Amino acid sequence: DQPALGEQLTALAASKRATLSATYWNALNASEEFEDYLRFANQPLPISSSQITDQDAVAALRKLTEIGAALPQQLPPDRAHIDALLQALQQSQRSSQLITSLAQTTHGLQQATQMLQATDSRLLCPMQAPSARSKILLNVFVLFYAGEIQPYLAQLQRLGQPWAEAVIALRAVPNIPDATAHSLDRLAGEQNSLWEEYQAALTKHTQAWQDLLGACESQPGQSGWQTPTEG
């Protein structure tokens, strides 16, 4: 009887361990904290002169990922520890604001890129040299784009890079439900995700500026480069 009981207990323990991954994902998806952290916000990230961070929440998301990845070989921590990690997600607005900012900024960059690409450099600087019109464009670039837009884009990059890496790591946890995988792929997957679309839009926009200013010899280091002043 004793060996039979031992075998039954071993089988029961193995059975419970086999369901840990499913239980983990069910609990994570059912939590409002997790859902709210990875959804669109009503407002984008604020424009701030000081650096905005989301370190505590990203660290909590990484820890939740480590817990899921270690299952079923390693048992999860107690409920209080899990609740503390979820609370860190709940206390952060940055992820949802970042998601909204990525969508809005990508759209804005795409529109601005189309305008730049539609500008005929032959009319802007007929002699392939700085002209009065190209100097106006350079003024816009230095005062508006480099002075106001680029700092915000840098803020998105600083906040978004560790966030995207954390989302990608969570996506790799085994036994992820299809719906959850799709949602995370849409946020930071390799193709057609918010993060990748933003990166592509930023690259194209930067290239559009370089092409247009370069055609008028107005890039940094070229003869037409100067630092305009307001007014």
What does each of the following model-derived ranges do?
Residues 1-111:
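Acidic/His-rich structured neighborhood in mature extracellular/periplasmic domains
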Residues 92-231:
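A cross-kingdom marker for long, charged
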